[in-house]
Amino acid sequence: MGVASFLRINQTDGSIEVGHINYSPLLQRKREGTEAMYLMMKWEIENGYRRYEWKCNALNKKSRYAAQRLGLSYEGVFRQMSINKGRNRNTAWFAAIDKEWKFLKECFVKYLKDENFGTSEKPIISLSELTKPILYKLDNDEFV
């Protein structure tokens, strides 16, 4: 079905990177896959970490979209960060920090409620619809 891992755990600075995410179509943009990401973020914050990071190949549009769907803020691209299969790889960075968690948690809880799914696997309100206003505020420095 799928796998996701914590990578680059930095206890000193309080950051954890999530990565090596490989979901089959059975989990992609589905309630169960989203809940797994929610639980990983929740664990990280509840255990005193301050920063939840997501990095991906800048050409991987599905991964970039997934990060933003989950409410992670786009932080930029590290150009020529590595060489992959003989080519330069640019790495896109996304993150959520502890101060944002209460807002993101509300989005996840609302999204994951049974009432949001009714009798269908498809949500009534998508997670993107819920996190989009949060990302807008983050990108416009409206959170202190």
Feature map (PLM): residue ranges:
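Catalytic-site neighborhood detector that most strongly recognizes the C-terminal catalytic loop/helix
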Residues: 88, 93-102
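Conserved beta-strand segments that form the floor/walls of ligand-binding pockets within enzyme
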Residues: 17, 22, 53-55, 93
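Acidic/histidine-enriched, glycine/proline-rich intrinsically disordered or flexible terminal extensions
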Residues: 102-144
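Conserved catalytic-core motifs of GNAT/GCN5-like acyltransferases
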Residues: 73-87
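Conserved GNAT acetyl-CoA-binding A-motif
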Residues: 45-56
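Conserved acetyl-CoA-binding loop-helix of GNAT-fold acetyltransferases
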Residues: 29-42, 61-65, 69
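Ligand-binding pocket scaffold of soluble enzyme catalytic domains
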Residues: 8-11, 52, 63-74
